[in-house]
């Protein structure tokens, strides 16, 4: 929970995920040139932060000392992922759209890569930067996120993954 600057894990450390949940899967297009598959998940998630966290925020209590809790009220979240594989493409195109009606929650897409590397790349205002995958011991932010403008990427000897996005300026390895 939190906002675009500060993220706080809820006290129950509950992660709500599509992993292991039933999905609607349909083949939207299939021809000699490409195949498009659509995967849809409907999940019930807390509608926002709980009353205690709201009170702490209104009292301007230091965010790093706040105790986070979630609302008991649930709202539906729709997650649609479209997989496109084209005959001449060098990789699989993945487009995920999330209809998020919940407030004050972080929503992320996770891409397990199986890559073995200690570095990754991301764009910044005027360059592509190389960063270590793990922060050093002096890193005090409870969130391990990094900033980017349009993409983050990593690779090893066997392959790689580039995630390009619009409107989301953070990522975590």
Predicted regions located by residue number:
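C-terminal (or distal) subdomains of carbohydrate-active enzymes
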Residues: 1-173
